[in-house]
Every structure is written in structure tokens, then in C-alpha cells.
Regions:
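Short, composition-biased local secondary-structure segments
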Residues: 1-3, 70
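C-terminal structural segments of small proteins and small subunits
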Residues: 59-82
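Solvent-exposed, flexible loop/coil residues
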Residues: 24, 49, 58-60
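A short, structured beta-strand/loop element
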Residues: 28-54
Length: 82
């Protein structure tokens, strides 16, 4: 199981939203078909066919819990997987 698989599993399990590393999510999102745009500390992910923007900012090397929930909601709603 790769690191991306483990990160995706953590996100989808909804048990560790406050404990997911920012760098792991940043490397996972392009593998899921998202495109990255950086504006200051904001890492903005878009994907063709999805109107929702995913805007992430690091806090002490981790993702904010509400942003992890946003990622999970988008992945489930649009049936996105590795």
C-alpha cells in the first residue's frame, strides 16, 4: 500500500481529520486528477468537470479538519478514487 493509498484511506475513514499531513494531501491530489494553483499560502485544487474549488492552507504541517472534510465530500460526491 503506497503513501497515497494510506492518505486517501485516512481521509475517507473520517477518523483522523485533524491529523493528516499537509504534504501528503498535496502529493495525493494530483494523483486524483486535480490541478494545483498556489497563491501565497493557499494551495487551490481544481478538476475539470467539478465546479468546487478545494483551497488548502497548512497549519503546523497539517491540514485543517474542515478542509479534510471538504476533500472527503468532493471525493464521495463525484466518486473519485485512485
Amino acid at each position: 500500500m503506497s503513501k497515497a493509498d494510506k492518505t486517501l484511506e485516512k481521509i475517507l475513514s473520517a477518523t483522523a481529520d485533524a491529523n493528516i499531513r499537509f504534504d501528503d494531501v498535496i502529493s495525493l491530489m494530483p494523483r486524483l486528477g486535480f490541478h494545483l494553483r498556489i497563491r501565497g499560502s493557499h494551495h487551490i485544487f481544481t478538476r475539470p468537470g467539478i465546479e468546487v474549488l478545494i483551497d488548502l492552507q497548512p497549519v503546523h504541517g497539517k491540514c485543517k479538519p474542515y478542509q479534510v472534510r471538504q476533500i472527503r465530500d468532493v471525493l464521495i460526491k463525484f466518486n473519485i478514487a485512485l
